[in-house]
Amino acid sequence: MNLVLNGQDLTIESIKVLIAQDQNVEICEEALSRVKQSRKIVDDIIADQETVYGITTGFGLFSDVLIDQDKYEDLQLNLIRSHACGIGEPFNDDVALVMMILRLNTMLKGHSGVSTALVEQLVFFINQRIFPVIPAQGSLGASGDLAPLSHLALALVGEGEVIYKGVRQESSKVLQSLNRAPHTLQAKEGLALINGTQAMTSQGVISYIEAEQLAYDAEWIAALTHQALNGIVDAYDAHVHIVRNSKEQLSVANRMLDWLEGSSLTTRQGELRVQDAYSLRCIPQIHGASFQVLNYVKEKLECEMNAANDNPLIFDKDDETLVISGGNFHGQPVAFALDFLKIGVSELSNVSERRIERLVNPQLNGDLPAFLSPHPGLQSGAMIMQYAAASLVSENKTLAHPASVDSIPSSANQEDHVSMGTIASRHGYQIVENVRNVLAIECVIALQAVELKGVDKLSQKTKEKYEEYREFVPSITEDRQFHKDIKVVSDYLKRSAYKK
């Protein structure tokens, strides 16, 4: 089953399914008709020799320079060559794939003036899983993601690099091996490829998919810790959460009770102590707030995924043709959302690290051995895993600083305010990876802690998780290289975000 694109109703869930099931894309006929109509308008502009930005003129400061008609195609090719100034390591293959899908989807709205040949080239790259090599640094997030999208565009015309079947190679060689011609850019098409927010948005989509799964995984991992510390279940009672008027908080509380149902390790208030520390007692409030952030981010990302963020935009309404220069390429809405994502997801690791501390600290972990060491003194046990978690959490605090509060003028001060949304997206994904590793550390330690408490006392649902993860995380019987355990759990958690 293919993902049908129409420029209007693409969702994050559909992207997730496409990645998980290795789906292809196809274009609905109505959308293709819109593409053809908008291209006809561009062709008419050229035939009538009208002065229109980016079609018959130069770009940015050169917008007043008229271009000779026989140079229109050169103009577009020069644009993507000169703008391909990306720096550093490339976005991963999933981000490159989503970037192509999102750029294609916005063209299908019929406001970009591209040819059906360009649409078909994007479909070919997507379905063949030819991933453009797109350096992740170098975008200001307005006028859109110019540098990253220029690298994407280069691949389509056979001048860039791609990853194909796991091998980094020249795009021209891959196209030749597949008997596919490079695309020849027509008037407006270079600009239509690079004027948009698809780099920041695609990285944001991948961050969201993985962060959402981590938010759910954080609950069962916390439930293991809760049982290891004989946590009090009363704090998750629905009465408490209904009066907070937060559906996300209530949902987390209900799921925590579900994870803990039937456990003989949990306690009631007053049984061992009256109250738990906040990192246990306030899981619904903290994790629930993160879900609120995720819901907000999802709404903003899906809005942008189906937006026309080209410039200029072409309209054909009521027999009137309009070509309007605007600023839909400005990434401010996405930048704000991704900065919010950074904060909301960071807190999942912040509170996780505090639970880790309670598991390993002999002054806080009840009758568990210090650092869960099999032989305290001779063996350090989980001591440095807590250090690693603390380091990642502190790094997240720096990364969570909002990128969108910064701006720097560019293009001779014509583009005098920019979003920095792509910086927010890159930092956001680094935070997601850090959070995943912190939760992996809590998981490794909590597995050992509940084993010491007695696996038979666990709730049925968390016992199943214990058994699942013990398949590849052995008990701690002596000191070993725990970084291997952390990595295998982190990788497993990541794969769970894309389960088929």
Swiss-Prot record:
Cytoplasm found in the keyword field: yes
Please name the HAMAP family in this protein's record.
His_ammonia_lyase
**Modified how:** Contains an active site 4-methylidene-imidazol-5-one (MIO), which is formed autocatalytically by cyclization and dehydration of residues Ala-Ser-Gly.
* Pathway the protein takes part in: Amino-acid degradation; L-histidine degradation into L-glutamate; N-formimidoyl-L-glutamate from L-histidine: step 1/3
Q: Which EC number applies?
A: 4.3.1.3
Q: What class of enzyme is it?
A: lyase
Keywords, A to Z, come to: Cytoplasm, Histidine metabolism, Lyase
Q: Site of the 5-imidazolinone (Ala-Gly) crosslink?
A: A142-G144
Instruction: Report the family membership.
Output: Belongs to the PAL/histidase family.
Q: Where in the cell is it found?
A: Cytoplasm
Record CDD domains: PAL-HAL
The yes or no answer to whether the keyword Cytoplasm is present is yes
GO-annotated biological processes: L-histidine catabolic process to glutamate and formamide; L-histidine catabolic process to glutamate and formate
Which reaction(s) does the protein catalyse, per the Swiss-Prot or TrEMBL entry?
L-histidine = trans-urocanate + NH4(+)
Q: Annotated Gene Ontology MF terms?
A: histidine ammonia-lyase activity
Q: Name one Pfam family in it.
A: Lyase_aromatic
Q: Where is it found, in Gene Ontology cellular component terms?
A: cytoplasm
- Any idea what this protein is called? Histidine ammonia-lyase
Q: According to the UniProt entry, which residues carry 2,3-didehydroalanine (Ser)?
A: S143
